[in-house]
Regions:
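Extracellular glycan-associated modules
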Residues: 1-159
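Extracellular beta-rich ligand/substrate-recognition surface
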Residues: 12-18, 183-191
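A glycine-anchored, Pro-Gly-centered beta-turn/N-cap motif
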Residues: 28-29, 204-206
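Short strand-edge motifs at loop-to-beta-strand transitions and within beta-strands
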Residues: 31-33, 193-197
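Aromatic-Pro/Gly-enriched surface loop or interdomain linker
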Residues: 152-187, 214-364
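Helical hinge/lid and interdomain linker segments adjacent to catalytic or ligand-binding clefts
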Residues: 181-187, 196-198, 202-204, 324-414
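Short, aromatic- and glycine-rich surface loops/edge beta-strands on solvent-exposed regions
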Residues: 206-212
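A glycine-rich, often tryptophan-bearing local segment used as a flexible ligand/cofactor-contacting loop or short
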Residues: 378, 382-465
Length: 465
């Protein structure tokens, strides 16, 4: 039994070879949907109504059908056709998902919707307003059939009962009981492990890259080695902006997609300079950055380093000639110039990253004489700013060597490292704007957006901004 959308924006219910459909639905409008199948009569019924006070239920049905053969074990998937691969994926919001071991009557369906609660005997009833910071779906029914989200769809989203009275999902969870699924959500490719390498205990702190070759092609995968925890090996620390790299990961610039001149210039310059040849604009299968949109037009709010990040590569250029008469480098490729200069000048330094700064705080910094940023330290958690301010106020020397720094507030997935969230709300230079009422992070429930709007402008930390 499958419920999906067709290309005409109609809901389609299918059992065996029989399909019934609704009328075309209005985009960005909440709709109540009830799908029932009565095994005794072979009746398949699909009912729907817009979620407005005056709307009536409409329905379509087919009769005389045979029940599908049971499959054991069975897996229910939401917003996709199957668990093994992302087939027939869904773009849109879902809330208040209930399943029953029998076909409900029209009256029971109406009563359940009016009460905003399941009836007494659900097989399971998911309340998406619970455990919002996690990937867990809570079943409020008697069977406790917990669900699991894959690839981090957006939570803490406005649902059908949103009134606008509360802007924070923690204060009115029933008004933020929706999950926004996107067909291009991806925080992990899910590839099997091809290589396992243990970093030697005596490897010098620094920036490294794994060079791989296959089928006549080569690639490089950068990684960073900090000193042993609690044992700095130099007086200089270079803070690598790994969270900023992740937020920008696979940024598909509009110029590359929309301008043939710009695209030709980028490809030509990459070839002429022997630069990294792959542009994220040609590879949306690896998921784009939080500076891009999902395929349904919603801004991408979650990014991950558990996937290829094509612009976090040695030799990747962002801007080609003649648009910019310079190196064309940003972020990681630009920051490597600082690392190389320090090495050439004979300075001993340690590499530390945003990850260690967030988790270790001031303890990470306190033994360094100076901490240097890279060229573009833009995205930070509260814990990171707290640590940098404490280091500075204790007499530490913080060298801000970049621009556009300490600008956006981010949240980290509490369940898994390497997954970052940004809500672009209420001000700032934004690639997209969060919807009203959706300015609070799903990962920690805090108000997101600019650090300036959280009372901590960059000028407070480094004097400029």
């Amino acid at each position: 039994l499958v419920l999906t959308f067709d290309n005409a924006a109609r809901l389609a219910a299918r059992i065996g070879e029989t399909t019934i459909t609704t009328e075309p639905l209005t985009i960005r409008q909440w709709v109540d949907v009830a799908l029932t199948f009565d095994q005794a009569t072979g009746r398949l019924r699909l009912a729907w109504r817009p979620v407005t006070a005056a709307a009536d239920w409409r329905s379509t049905e087919a009769t005389g059908l045979e029940a599908p053969a049971a499959r054991t074990p069975s897996v229910l998937t939401i917003a996709a056709a199957g668990p093994a691969s992302p087939l027939a994926t869904f773009d849109g919001r879902i809330e208040n998902l209930q399943f029953y071991p029998r076909a409900l009557s029209a009256d029971e369906i109406s009563r359940s919707r009016a009460a905003q609660a399941p009836l007494a005997d659900p097989l399971f009833a998911f309340d998406f307003a619970r455990e919002t910071t996690t990937s867990t779906l809570v079943d409020t029914g008697p069977n406790g059939l917990t669900g699991r989200l894959v690839n981090h769809p957006a939570r803490g989203m406005r649902s059908s009962r949103w009134s606008g009275h509360e802007m924070c999902w923690r204060h009115a969870p029933g008004e933020y009981a929706a999950i926004h699924f996107h067909s291009d959500d991806m925080t992990d490719c899910g590839w099997p492990t091809a290589l396992d390498w243990q970093v030697p205990a005596d490897l010098k702190s620094g920036c490294y890259a794994l060079r791989i070759e296959a089928g006549g092609e080569t690639d490089n995968i950068p990684f960073f080695v900090p000193p042993p925890k609690g044992r700095p090996t130099a007086k200089i620390a270079v803070l690598v902006s790994t969270f900023t790299y992740t937020v920008y990961a696979n940024h598909s610039r509009p110029e590359f997609r929309l301008s043939q001149r710009w695209r030709k210039g980028w490809l030509g310059q990459a070839a002429e300079w022997n630069a990294y040849p792959h542009n994220p604009g040609d590879h949306p299968e690896y998921a784009l950055s939080t500076y891009n949109d999902h395929v349904d037009g919603a801004g991408i709010s979650i990014s991950s380093w558990h996937r290829p990040m094509l612009n976090v590569r040695i030799g990747y250029i962002t801007y080609p000639f003649p648009d910019i008469r310079a190196s064309g480098l940003r972020h990681y490729p630009a920051d490597t110039h600082l690392h190389t200069w320090l090495e050439d000048q004979g300075y001993d330094f340690n590499i530390i990253t945003d990850f260690e700064l967030h988790h270790e705080g001031l303890d990470l910094l306190k033994d360094y004489t100076v901490v240097m940023t890279g060229s573009h330290p833009e995205y930070h958690t509260r814990e990171m700013l707290d640590a940098l301010e404490a280091y500075r106020d204790a007499g530490g020397r913080l060298m801000y060597l970049g621009g556009n720094g300490f600008y956006w507030k981010i949240a980290l997935d509490p369940e898994r490292d390497g997954i970052v969230e940004i809500r672009r709300g209420e001000g700032g230079i934004r690639a997209w704007a969060a919807e009203p009422g959706e300015y609070y992070n799903q990962f920690d429930g805090e108000y997101g957006g600019l650090w300036r709007r959280n009372g901590r402008p960059p000028q407070n930390l480094v004097g400029v901004g």
